Each structure stands twice: as C-alpha cells, then as structure tokens.
From Swiss-Prot:
Source organism of this protein record: Caldanaerobacter subterraneus subsp. tengcongensis (strain DSM 15242 / JCM 11007 / NBRC 100824 / MB4) (Thermoanaerobacter tengcongensis)
Keyword Ion transport attached: no
Biological or metabolic pathway of the protein: Amino-acid biosynthesis; L-tryptophan biosynthesis; L-tryptophan from chorismate: step 4/5
Keywords: Amino-acid biosynthesis, Aromatic amino acid biosynthesis, Decarboxylase, Lyase, Tryptophan biosynthesis
Designated name of the protein: Indole-3-glycerol phosphate synthase
The keyword Disulfide bond appears for this protein: no
A single MF term (Gene Ontology): indole-3-glycerol-phosphate synthase activity
InterPro entries registered for this protein in UniProt: Aldolase_TIM (IPR013785), Indole-3-glycerol_P_synth (IPR045186), Indole-3-glycerol_P_synth_dom (IPR013798), Indole-3-GlycerolPSynthase_CS (IPR001468), RibuloseP-bd_barrel (IPR011060)
Length: 256
C-alpha cells in the first residue's frame, strides 16, 4: 500500500528532523503575516484552493518546468482563495522550504499539505509560516483530536481529511470544523468524485466541506457546490494549465 510506504518513510524523516532541529528551536517563530484559512473558505461562493504540487506517486512528475515563484504569483493573480503547498519530499517532490517562499509572494492563506504522523510536524508547520495544516484521519485515527487541539492552540487552522464513513465519524467526534473529503483512495490512489456526494450527506451544515482530488473542470466545481461543498482543492489540473487558463477557470466558477 502506498500510504503505508509513505508513513514508514515519514517516521524515519521525522526522527532525523528532531535531531537536526529540536522542539525548542521550532518554538522560536518569526512574526509573519497570518492568513485566515478558515474564513477564506467561508465567503458564500465556492472557494478555490490552488495547490502547488510537483509530482505524485500515481502520476510521477506532473509539472516538468516547476517554478515555485511563478506558480505562487499565478495563483495570486488568478485570485484563488487559498494556496495549498505539498511539502512531502520523497513521493511528491516537495520541500518544507516552499512554505516561507510562498508566504513572501502572496497574501492568501497557506495550507501545509503533508503526511503528519507526529506532533513535531504541527509545530514545524507553524515555524515554516503555514496558516493551516492537513491532518489525515486514515493515518492518525485516535490521535486526531489531540493533534487538532495542538494545532489550534498554536494558531493553525486544520483541514481534516477523510475518505470513508468511519473516518468521517472520527473527524466529527473530534469536533473538527473543516472537513476535507478526498475523492482519492489513499490505499489504491484511485479517484472517484462521487465520494464527495456519498459522504457529504452525513456532514452537519455548520461544517466547512472541502472536496479534494479529481476536480478537472469548472463544471465539476459547480456540481460539487450544488451538493453543499464550500471549497475545492485543485492541484494536478492547475499544474497542467498556464496562467491564462487558471484565471479563466476561476472566473468561470465565479460566474464571470
């Protein structure tokens, strides 16, 4: 299973990071502009989170000519509502250092997207300058509530990711207010956008629902919005578009 492989790699990676930069160093956070991730997704119209994603285990390299500065500026110009930055190194070719670079280039809230297995990574996310962090129920299970509490205590919003009914139940019991429905099964990496349709029926209306993966067209976004989705996260599709097409996509979703 790909997820198991990623988690095993993360365990070793975090162990090494703790040796290089102990907890106490992560607490020395420089003052950076803080974006309000939660409110950026709750403005009435469906919000768009543009993702910076160089590669994936299923597709390999997605964007050959990867220019972080150019992509961040494109998202800023296209007026997406928030930016997701994949920082996983081995399988997605990301870097933690992308976060502070992107923060310098945008006023949009920044989500750190990685595979969090240890509370160390939550403090690290804050240290890097992220405004929000992704927590995956399939990885954390009963650790979820404790990790959510830590994130909130240090001023980070949390996007809690689910794919199955059981995971959704765990997220709701933990009191999570931003629920990300991943249309991709992390065990097989197969994508089905109908996953959102299936799960959203069981989510209270006061929660902010984000649909992730497999979103390719403005029509997909409008369909998801009609189900009650408040925001969509788009990575691979945007990574294959130039600035003009991304702007056009966002404009069409907003009725322009």
């Amino acid at each position: 299973m790909i997820l198991e492989e990623i988690v095993n790699f993360k365990k070793e990676e975090v162990r090494k990071k703790k040796e290089l930069k102990p907890y106490n160093e992560l607490l020395n956070v420089n003052a950076v502009y803080r974006g309000d991730f939660k409110n950026s997704l709750n403005k009435g119209k469906v919000a768009i989170i543009g993702e910076i994603k160089r590669a994936s285990p299923s597709k390999g390299i997605i964007r050959e000519e990867f220019d972080l500065v150019e992509i961040a500026k494109t998202y800023e110009k296209a007026e997406v509502d928030a930016i997701s930055v994949l920082t996983e190194k081995r399988f997605f070719k990301g870097e933690g250092g992308y976060i502070p670079q992107v923060k310098k280039l945008t006023t949009k809230p920044v989500l750190r997207k990685d595979f969090v297995i240890d509370e160390y990574q939550i403090y690290e996310s804050k240290f890097l300058g992220a405004d929000a962090v992704l927590l995956i129920v399939a990885i954390l299970e009963d650790k979820l509530k404790g990790f959510c509490d830590i994130a909130k205590q240090i001023g980070l919003d949390v996007l809690v990711e689910v794919h199955e009914e059981e995971e959704l139940e765990t997220a709701l019991k933990a009191g999570c207010d931003i629920i990300g429905i991943n249309n991709r099964d992390l065990k097989t990496f197969k994508v089905d956008i109908k996953t959102t349709e299936r799960l959203i029926k069981n989510i209270p209306k006061d929660k902010i629902v984000v649909s992730e993966s497999g979103i390719k067209t403005p029509e997909d976004v409008l369909y998801l919005s009609s189900l009650g989705v408040k925001a969509v996260l788009i990575g691979e599709s945007f990574m294959k578009m130039d600035e003009g097409r991304i702007k056009e996509f966002v404009k069409k979703v907003r009725g322009g």
